[in-house]
Amino acid sequence: MNKTEFLLKLKLQKGIGYVKLLTIARQLDEGNTIKLADLQELDLSQELSDACIRVFRDLELDHLVKQIYRQCEVVGFFDEVYPQKLRQIYRPPLILFAKGDTSLLSKETITIVGSRYPTNYSEKVINRMVPNLVRKNIAVASGLAKGVDSLAHQAALRNQGKTIAVIGNGLNHFYPRQNFDLQSEIVQKGLLISEYLPDTPPRPFRFPERNRILAGLSQGVIITEAKDKSGSLITANLAMQENRDVYAVPGPITNQLSAGPNQLIEDGAIPIIDFKFDEGKI
């Protein structure tokens, strides 16, 4: 059995969350496959040993896995296509579910995030910024939320660029509903990924969890507009923790949506003062 299927069957079991899955994954060797006999070499609790054995013996798990593979691609931590940058982050996703062009996982990428309720300042900045990224063959990643996320994805597609959407729910859900057409277009022309099983519904706590993937997947993160308590700042701070470049679009101090980017600049983020994007900067 390949290790991706092994991890997926573990993930499907009740009571096996991220920490337990990581405990098992850390003990696997560097090969691509695992056999039932290999389990004897693992130093696991009885609970985790039983879960590993069920992977090989539970026919219901086989059925569930086949259903998932009919719906999407599954990329595991041990697969060659798994992005190297994500391997380096704290709490890397061990399984990614994907629809679209998974070769984009190895492409140079910049994440753009910001307010769900931006002013036209964000729209103007993104519409000037993204064509330059596309010309440099850089993919644009974002979270498919309304507002800045949607503007970033749309600008990439409009300029015949590549875009990656990292969502905080399963791939079978369209959230927000207003982005149904955009999500469908990203599947056709870009890449849609999630660490959640395909039928997982959107829940508020999942979006901050998703942000670590947005931060880790890219070389850098750009914040256009965000309030000082915005979730976009979570992504920016995660990027800083992972030694990624953080860029912020400065704005007037009278605009509360510029409070987040301005604070990031004060904390050491690189201010975006033009749209040249020299190779040494991005």
Show where each model-derived region lies.
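Short, positively charged patches
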Residues: M1-K124
